[in-house]
Design a protein with these regions (language model features):
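Short strand-loop junctions, especially beta-strand C-caps/beta-turns
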Residues: 47-49
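Active-site-adjacent loop and "lid" segments of alpha/beta metabolic enzymes
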Residues: 1-31, 35, 51-137
C-alpha cells in the first residue's frame, strides 16, 4: 500500500506492481527476521485492492506465483473487493460472490496457500471442484 489508508487510492503508482511489491515485501521479511522473527512464522499479502488500480490488481493476480520466490506462504484476499464491481456491473459488496470465487480460484491456481474470504462454504466447494479439475488425469 502506498501512502496512508485515507490516501492509498489517490493515484497509486508502480513501475510494475508485482515486482515493486515483491521488492517491498522482500525488504520487510528481511527486517522482520533481523528483529528476531523466525521466517517460518511469516506470511505475506501482496495487498490486492489496497492502494492499487484495477490494472495493478490484475497484474498482481496474474503474477502471484512470483511471490513464491520469497519463501513464505502467500495470503490472498480479494473477497468482495471493489475491483470485482469495477470489472462487472458495479454490484454492491454483498453481491460479489461469483467474482470473489473467480479471483480466489485464480489465486489457488497460482499457489496461494491462504485465502481470506467472506463466503467460506461456497469457497470450500469451489476449491474442491478446482482441486479435482487440476488433478484430473
Amino acid at each position: 500500500m502506498q501512502g496512508q489508508p485515507e490516501t492509498m487510492q489517490d493515484e497509486p503508482h508502480y513501475d510494475f506492481a508485482p515486482v515493486d511489491i515483491y521488492q517491498f515485501l522482500e525488504e520487510r521479511i528481511e527486517a522482520a527476521m533481523a528483529a528476531g522473527i523466525v521466517k517460518s512464522h511469516i506470511a505475506i499479502d501482496p495487498g490486492f485492492g489496497f492502494g492499487k488500480t484495477v490494472a495493478h490488481n490484475l497484474q498482481i493476480l496474474n503474477w502471484l506465483s512470483l511471490f513464491h520466490g520469497l519463501g513464505v506462504p502467500i495470503l490472498f484476499g480479494a473477497s468482495r473487493k471493489s475491483t470485482i464491481a469495477k470489472l462487472s456491473k458495479g454490484e454492491p459488496a454483498d453481491q460479489r460472490l461469483a467474482g470473489s470465487l473467480a479471483l480466489a480460484m485464480a489465486a489457488y491456481r497460482q499457489g496461494a496457500q491462504i485465502l481470506r474470504v467472506h463466503d467460506v462454504a461456497e469457497t470450500v466447494q469451489a476449491l474442491a471442484v478446482e482441486h479435482a479439475l487440476l488433478h484430473a488425469g
